[in-house]
Amino acid sequence: MSRFRFVWTLILLVAAPGLCVAQAVCPLNGVGSRKLICMLPQALGSSGFNYALFGILNSRPFPNIKPISQAVGTRLSQLPTASPSSGISLTYDTALKTFVPSTDDNLGPIFGERASTIGPHKLFFGFSYQYFNFDSIDGHKLDSIPLSFHANPILASFFPPSFDTPACNTTGFPADGSYDGSPCFSRDYVKTSYDISLKVNQYIFYLTYGLTRHFEVSAAIPVSNVRMSVVSHATIVPNSFAPVPPFVLNRYNFFQPQIAQAAPPPTVTVPNCTVAPCFDAVFSDSRSVTGLGDVIVRAKYQFYEGERVGLAGGLDARLPTGNEENFLGSGALGLKPFVVFSYRARVSPHAEVGYELNGNSLLYGDFVATPTPTKSALPSRFLYVAGANVAVTKRITAAFDIYGQRVYGASQVVSGQLTDFGACNDSDCTVVTQGGPIPTSLIKNTDISIVDASIGAKVRLFRHLLATGNVLLKLNDSGLRAKVVPLAGLSYVF
């Protein structure tokens, strides 16, 4: 049992540091955060949108920006991984009274699973590398995510009499009366476009140990490098006129340029603004984080072994060892019971289905501009893998799988429109020019299906050493997606 103790001691040592990850918040008080979870909420500055005069536009984008950050973080924490199966099956030799490598030339699936186990007191070690270059989320290109928002509604009586802000003409304002009594600068709105670059290098170490002939335990230990950059183009559309100076060109809302002027200063200046008033600004940031991801431990039991057909069941436990604040992990315990069918032959079909239940995570909670962040439940998932392996030669097996998941209650990015309240033609806003629809992004909670095709091969380099190559191809647009995900790996059975 020394190998078993070694394997599980190693797993616990690796997992322990991440189990105590503390919660954090993305402040909007001028204090920047270097955590990846804060990149989108702070994309327009660490004070929120407090570059405009008196922060009138402050905080408006975050109801839609935060769910996008949630969707990115959640899906990064649930990337598909190769199966921790050995690829080299063992059979019991009655003459030798021990397990020996099977004469079956089929080396098994890559993303799928087969019912057979590694054999008693056998140890399998594997390593794989995957590269994700994400280019879309729910069918929307990551390099051009639009987001538009109005200024906050605010009563004109909020300001002192010396600040000439009479209630504005209500023409074009929402019919629910939420903007009635607001000054005319509430007609101003902002158009933004987010160019998001997101790349992940994922390294996974696999350990499998056979306890008995039909029962094995395994672990997948990921280490990821996540590189993220965001370029945000923001434009303030001035639909109102300020009556008198010191407002530059009689405009209320503008970015503070880095030049001397007589206007009341906002809290933060924008480096790329060189004229006054400045209505266009570009914000950019990039970060890279490397660390341990969520360790997955598995127990699998083969409860039926026929001449060719095998059936097995098991349980995956995803431990919250990865830091969710840096998109390295989910921040929640996940449990996935599963069942496996496989058929042993030169052409070997197989199938696996499972249902994952998740705990509460900061990724789905409230983490922006709050001193007391909260957690909420991650969406549950139904997962399935179906495919076949073909023994091309004694040393080469080709593998094909359909890898799918149904995510329940996920945050989905959808196209939407913001209504322009209309522009004032003078400082008294006696005449309003009607506005039109403005492209933006919205978030809705819905069930989504994510489907990929896996195509690859295993090559037996030596008796117990296998090399694996694979590509994962997206078959639909739902979720955070890369067109092609390459994988390379090595595995060995002791």
Regions found by a protein language model. Name each.
Residues 110-112, 189-193, 281-286, 322-327, ...:
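Extracellular loop and loop/strand-boundary signature of outer-membrane beta-barrel proteins
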